[in-house]
């Protein structure tokens, strides 16, 4: 089994961090992007972010870009394996929502 298949559910911060890496970004830009995507509902601190970055690199889900030596900010991007893991999570969440909607619709039909 690949790591993407073994990934399990992503935490909400990890979900948004991985989503953000669909575009190459540096750490601070990720923190800003997550706040923007979630309308300020999710805020990621530097410790959480860089811990997640290290974990995602270890899993092979993101990679560092080779920037110019003069660049102070290190940029990262999602890998194919990271995209596979992310899309697996999106599918899991869609199935979860479909199950919930089915139960709600059935309950509403019985109440009517």
PLM features per residue range, with description:
Residues 87-112:
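Amphipathic alpha-helical dimerization/coiled-coil segments
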